[in-house]
Each structure stands twice: as C-alpha cells, then as structure tokens.
Amino acid sequence: MKNSLKMKNLLPALVITMAMSAVMSLCIAPNAYASKWDAKMTPEQVEATLDKKFAEGNYSPKGADSCLMCHKKSEKVMDLFKGVHGAIDSSKSPMAGLQCEACHGPLGQHNKGGNEPMITFGKQSTLSAEKQNSVCMSCHQDDKRVSWNGSHHDNADVACASCHQVHVAKDPVLSKNTEMEVCTSCHTKQKADMNKRSSHPLKWAQMTCSDCHNPHGSMTDSDLNKPSINETCYSCHAEKRGPKLWEHAPVTENCVTCHNPHGSVNDAMLKTRAPQLCQQCHASDGHASNAYLGNTGLGSNVGDNAFTGGRSCLNCHSQVHGSNHPSGKLLQR
C-alpha cells in the first residue's frame, strides 16, 4: 500500500522531468532540428512559407536572445560574434537592427518546435541562389556590386554563401593569404595553370585573384577590374603600355593573344614557344615558315644563320612589345 502511494506521488514529477528533457533536447542539439523542415517540405513550399512569414513580419521582441535559447550550444552559431556581422558596437552590423532575423527572416513560429522554416544559406540550403543573395544584397549595395546581375557568377547561380562565410572571425575569401584557395575550389583549370612553371605569384600570396577580377561582376568579358585585358595588364606592366613609335598589333590589341595570364609551361607565360607562337600570325610571307623547316627533312635547305640556328624569331626581333628606335620598324632594336 505504501509503495503504491509512493508511486502515485512520483508520477507527476516523472512526467515533468520527461517533458523538460524533451524541451532541453531541442536546445542542446540544434543541428538536429535546425533544418528538419527540409525533409517535410518541398523547396517551393519552403519559399512560399518564408514569403508568408515576411508578409506577416512576426519578429521576436527579444531578438537574438530568442535564437540563442536553443542555438547557443552550437559553436558555428556562436562564432558569428567573432566577426563583423556579429559586432554589437557597429551601426552597420545586423546586431544593431533585427539581429539574427535580419538575415534568417522573422522568427514566427520557428521556436515552437523548430518546424517552421527560416532562411538558410550555403550548399545545404533548399533556397535558390537568387533568394539567398537577395538577403545579402539588401545591405551590400556598393559600387563594386553594381554589375552583379548578369555577371558570370550570377548566371551560374552562385550564391554569396558559396564564397563568403559569415559565422567566422575572418572570412577566408577576404584574406590575401586564402582568397586563391576559395576561388580555385571551383576554378580548377586556372588552379592547374597557376601551378605551372611560369605564372603570376599567386601561390606566394604576392597577388590575388581580385587584383585582376571583380568577383561581383563588371562590364568586361572576364569580370575584370579594368575596362579591358590590356588595361588590366598595364596596371602592373606599365613599361609595355606604349604608345610606341613602332607597335606590334597583338600587344596593342590583346595581351592574351600570346600570353596565358594564369600560367604556362613556357617562359613568360607564353601560350606556346617561338617560333610556333609567331607563326600563328606570320606564316604567309615565307620568312617565318622557313625556320620551321629546320625540324624536317628539308632542314638542310634552310641555311645557317642566327635565325635558324636558334629557331626563334626572338633572336632578331627582340622588341616584340614595340620599339621607339628610329630604325626599329622590324622590332629588332
């Protein structure tokens, strides 16, 4: 009899304890519930729900405190406060306004079990890149991003979060030492070129991809910072700019006619060695073609001279970037 009474007295406490354990499990393991709606809702349903939440504007009166009740156990979440987006003393930081909800959208009923979706970012997000980027662009609207719409990255459905990290002390893509690693995680062909024997000093962090390119888009074909390829090259190689008294058309028109800007197995990042490189244009007058015959059975008919001896146009035409010498018409001096 005493044991049965004792059990009756313990039951309410047991029920309360189990209920509290269930609630605590939501808070202690936020990663298990943070995007549980993905398994139950299609991407279209997620977007429709988010649109409805924004229309209702049901933001939490407690701001980040509401979010941290569950998410403070996540190291990734808390790393936000180590970076600029989590700065509480900056008027430009999300923390100065709607805080977490400035990026992830209104809380709504999300904290009632975590079933109602929030905006998520990155590869695991079911939201389109356009939807994700619209959140970032609502703040980041400076002149460097004026050409984002229609840029190479925009047309490839690249999300801001594909390159940028927010919940970190320092975004790797904004560091000169790690920017190239971020870019070449997608641009693998360029990475291979950068590791060839002749290349720009990106491997040693003496320059970065953004020294030449604007990743947010520009009016040029390769999203360059300057209006043209040549203007981009001249920003470092000013001695090649000209105008020269005697000019070489490939130099004035397009540097990449001869050079591979990301790297090459040939000296000076040339696409191929001379004379083959020169013969791509100078093949009809017979002069340059004669040198090539030296590698065939007809080589004995070419004759011995400085040109055929080294089989390089550069033995004579040394000033290929142009000449200011009065008698430099043939770019020989």
UniProtKB/Swiss-Prot annotation:
Which keywords has UniProt assigned to this entry?
A: Signal
Q: Which organism is it from?
A: Shewanella baltica (strain OS185)
The question of whether RNA-binding is a record keyword is answered with no
Does the keyword section mention Signal?
Answer: yes
Instruction: Indicate the secretion signal residues.
Output: 1-34
Q: Which PROSITE patterns match?
A: MULTIHEME_CYTC (PS51008)
Question: Can you name one GO molecular function term for this protein?
Answer: oxidoreductase activity
From which domain of life does this come?
Bacteria
InterPro entries noted in UniProt: Cytochrom_c_NrfB-like_dom (IPR053875), Decahaem_cyt-c_DmsE (IPR020015), Multihaem_cyt_sf (IPR036280), Multiheme_Cytochr_ET (IPR051829), Paired_CXXCH_1 (IPR010177)
- Report what the protein is called: Multiheme cytochrome MtrA
